[in-house]
C-alpha cells in the first residue's frame, strides 16, 4: 500500500500484517538521489521501472513524512499509534535522516516496541555508528542487507565493523532481494551469513 494512509495501515493490521515500511522508492529523499540529473549514476533496479512509468505518463509523486514546518505529519502520527496498538514492526524504509531523527523517537514515545532502521549501510540511508547507537537507545535494530554489499554500494568490511561496534545483538541481516537479475533470497542470505561468520 503506498502513501501515508492510516486507514490502509489499520485495515492491514486487522488482517494480520505485522510489518509497516515507511516510504521507500517513492520517498522524496530517495527519488532526489536516484534522479539527480547525473546520467552516469548507477541507479537502483527499481529506478528503471519508475522511468518506464513516467514515459508511459504514469504519475510518480514523492512522499515526505514531514510537513512544511519540519514536523511529522498527522497521518504519520496516526500510523505510529496504529503500529503501537497492534504491536507491529516499524521499518524506516528509505526516508531521509531528518525524517528518521523525528520518526524514531516519536515512535518510541508512542509505544512502538519494534523498530528497524532499514539499510543502515546503503548510500541513501547510510547512518554513522553514532547514529545507529542513538537509534538503538530507542529500542531499534539496525538492518544490514546482502545486496548493499553484493552490488558494490558498501564494502563488506564496513558492514562488519558497523555490526561489531553497534553490537550484533542490535543488528539484523536481510537480503533485500527479489530483483530478478540477482540470486534467490535464500541463496543471498546463506552467502551473507557465511561471510559474516
Could you say what each language-model-derived stretch is?
Residues 20, 24, 90, 142, ...:
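Divalent metal-coordination and catalytic microenvironments
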Residues 145, 168-185:
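Short acidic/histidine-rich active-site segments
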Residues 2-33:
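A generic, well-ordered mixed alpha/beta core segment in the N-terminal half of proteins
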Residues 27, 147-149, 178:
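Short, glycine-/Ser/Thr-/acidic-enriched flexible segments
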Residues 30, 151, 181:
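Glycine/Thr-rich phosphate-binding loops of Rossmann-like dinucleotide-binding domains
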Residues 1, 25-26, 95, 120-122, ...:
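Active-site metal-binding loops of divalent metal-dependent hydrolases
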Residues 139-151:
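His/Asp/Glu-enriched short active-site or ligand-binding loop at hydrolase and phosphoryl-transfer sites
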Residues 6-16, 36-116, 124-140, 154-173, ...:
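Histidine/acidic residue-rich metal-binding segments in metalloenzymes
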Amino acid at each position: 500500500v503506498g502513501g501515508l494512509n492510516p486507514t490502509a495501515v489499520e485495515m492491514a493490521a486487522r488482517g494480520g500484517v505485522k510489518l509497516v515500511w515507511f516510504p521507500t522508492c517513492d520517498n522524496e529523499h530517495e527519488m532526489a538521489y536516484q534522479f539527480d540529473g547525473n546520467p552516469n549514476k548507477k541507479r537502483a533496479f527499481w529506478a528503471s521501472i519508475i522511468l518506464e512509468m513516467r514515459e508511459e505518463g504514469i504519475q510518480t509523486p514523492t512522499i515526505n513524512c514531514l510537513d512544511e514546518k519540519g514536523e511529522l505529519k498527522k497521518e504519520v502520527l496516526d500510523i505510529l499509534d496504529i503500529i503501537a496498538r497492534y504491536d507491529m514492526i516499524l521499518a524506516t524504509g528509505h526516508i531521509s535522516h531528518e525524517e528518521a531523527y523525528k520518526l524514531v523517537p516519536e515512535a518510541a514515545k508512542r509505544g512502538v516496541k519494534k523498530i528497524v532502521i532499514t539499510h543502515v549501510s546503503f548510500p541513501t540511508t547510510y547512518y554513522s555508528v553514532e547514529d545507529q547507537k542513538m537509534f538503538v537507545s530507542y529500542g531499534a535494530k539496525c538492518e544490514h542487507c546482502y545486496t548493499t554489499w553484493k552490488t558494490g554500494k558498501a564494502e563488506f568490511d564496513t558492514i562488519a565493523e558497523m555490526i561489531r561496534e553497534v553490537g550484533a545483538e542490535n543488528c539484523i541481516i536481510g537480503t533485500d532481494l527479489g530483483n530478478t537479475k540477482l540470486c534467490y533470497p535464500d541463496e543471498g542470505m546463506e552467502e551473507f551469513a557465511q561471510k559474516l561468520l
